[in-house]
């Protein structure tokens, strides 16, 4: 297939003209922030390769083996707007599925089920706590489209 320029979603080097997504930001600085267990934001205009950068970072971290890195897009929570419980539930479901895919195990889904009866933002906190206790490596969450959430929903997820 002939390669072409892509501005609609993650880059696929086999069919898109692309540059190394990890060369688009200071990788050493980002890895230092991760080692220091700090939060950080990758901010750039629309369709500039943020998702491709996040996916590449996730792949790199998993390949290095010190962390379990999981990429999740939480844009689906946008439809629930200020319904915090729906947004938190959707976020937990998304994360559980992404962890299941990476671990090739249903354990994240089972942990998610054990938190379904919890209310509010404690659901997400307890889900992540239980998941981190069950896993042998520290977790790095790479969350895309967090800015799609608004108001109390955004604050609760963060």
Model segments located where?
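Conserved NTP-binding/hydrolysis module of P-loop NTPases
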Residues: 81-105
